[in-house]
């Protein structure tokens, strides 16, 4: 098995998520390191948190706010956000982001108040 993986986001189907729609790369049983997503946020997302997952967002297009543990932070293209486990967060506005999840995204680690 190769020591690398390649993903072509133009060949990945988008799935519904609390933030809008996501294309998730490197998700599979052979990867325990991280996943990378392109997320299209079309409306205000639902506040949530993760008990195990760390997320790194990079805003590519659009603008809005990130709500992070109650703080409202304006975001524009090329803003990066590091979200630790336990941080309640949501995106507000219309934007496209890259989301890196460490360890890989697990829908069972998505918690809502």
Residue ranges, per PLM feature:
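Conserved short histidine dyad/triad with adjacent acidic residue
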Residues: 35-51
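A cytosolic small-molecule/anion-sensing beta-strand core signal
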Residues: 37, 60-61, 76-77, 93
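Surface-exposed loop/turn positions
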Residues: 43-45, 79, 87, 95
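Short glycine/proline-enriched turns and hinge-like loops at secondary-structure junctions
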Residues: 50-52, 93-94
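Glycine- and acidic-residue-biased ligand/ion/polar-headgroup-sensing regions
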Residues: 52-65, 69
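Short acidic-glycine-tyrosine-enriched beta hairpin
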Residues: 70-86
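Ligand-binding loop in jelly-roll beta-barrel domains
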Residues: 85-110
